[in-house]
Amino acid sequence: MSKAERLLWFVSTIEDTRFLKAFYDSYEGAIDVVHLNLLTRISLIGFEANHYIPLNKYANKTVNPDVSKIFNLLSGRLNQDETLLAYQSVWGLLDSFKTRYNNSVFVIPSGRHVHHVAATDFAKSRKTKRLYINYSNFPGYTFFDPEGTDCLASIYKRPDLLDEMYPEPIDAKRVFSKFYELKKNQSTIPQASSGGLNQILKKLAFSLDTIMQKLIGYVGDRRLTLSAVFAKKNTGDFFEYDEVDLSNRFMFFPMQVSTDQQVLVNYKGGSIEKALEEALSLAQSKNLVLYVREHPAEANRDKVRKKLEEMRQSYTDIRVVSQSVSELIEHSVEIVTINSTVGLECRLAGKPVSFLGDSFYEKASDMQLAKYLDRYLVEVDYHKSIVSDNDINKILKLLR
């Protein structure tokens, strides 16, 4: 490896900090850290690095971007003023470094938070290299890209980059079969919503973090009041699923998390409720019944189920089902999705699929999709972090 570059790594979750530490164990260069909340700072006590918190005192008030489409605001994690202040504080912090990170790489998991957006805009203005990280949703694989995640990724803008990077053709059928089986046999998803006591403890931690943020003058990636921690749920876990015959002709709609970036930002409808209506309209136009499956990581379950129940009461051609995703894909006539991994699974299975949102999975050819899976994704598990020298070399090569 050539001389290792200094990395400025943005972290917002415990998973981020674990992966950072695993990466650091095999990395030859220095890594400094920007914290999007105080919980990550606590988790990295003892980690040898420069640690930064974008305090309000750093805010550059001359920078006034439009924050109306930023995830933290749309998801209700921050209000308008908090979102703008967080952006300005990150910009001001980075500007205070002067030339310290001119030849560094900003490492930005997800890219969705306002702090990530500010870091991205600042890096672009200084021509600083960036590396983004996202879950691949295939166990044992992680996505890295120099321009962004989802529809901001370099390969979304230009799927033909995959042909330039990997000019030799590969056996797409073999790759599709391998990854379809990998997903089909996945028993749990790492980001699945935890319930009961674990969920309360997680919310309690964020509410305490909110108190600390206010005490030191800082806007993190979310603010959560104590009252929200113990807010009473209306419907609990009781919900009646429809009994269905999978031999009937139907269109399958796998729901995404209502606060997902794909729903709030990358889908023009802007809400899961609108997506449900659009999916039903598409099914009706093809004389198909719509089978809907909830997302297991949905945190706003009561709100989503209320909408589902309203639609069941209003229409006779919608069913809410509990069968496995693989069964529903196999037996459906067609699938409609916003931009979920299920859409990719359908491509792998050769099933007709319609995407409501912006999606690389829709734009890529079969060969490009196979190269993405087999060559572009890095075989390292973000949630079970063991990172080798070879993994790091492959990741950093993507900076091209």
Predicted regions and their residues:
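Leloir-type glycosyltransferase catalytic cores
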Residues: 154-202, 365-400
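A donor-sugar binding/catalytic signature common to diverse glycosyltransferases
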Residues: 108-111, 115, 322-367
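Active-site donor-nucleotide binding/catalytic segment of nucleotide-sugar enzymes
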Residues: 244-276, 280, 287, 293-298, ...
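Active-site and donor-binding regions of nucleotide-sugar-utilizing enzymes
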Residues: 10-11, 18-22, 65-165, 343
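N-terminal subdomain of nucleotide-sugar transferases
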Residues: 1-53
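Catalytic donor nucleotide-activated moiety binding site of glycosyltransferases and closely related
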Residues: 277-320
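Conserved nucleotide-sugar phosphate-binding/catalytic loop shared by glycosyltransferases and other
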Residues: 45-76
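Extended, charge-rich helix/loop segments that form flexible
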Residues: 170-246, 254
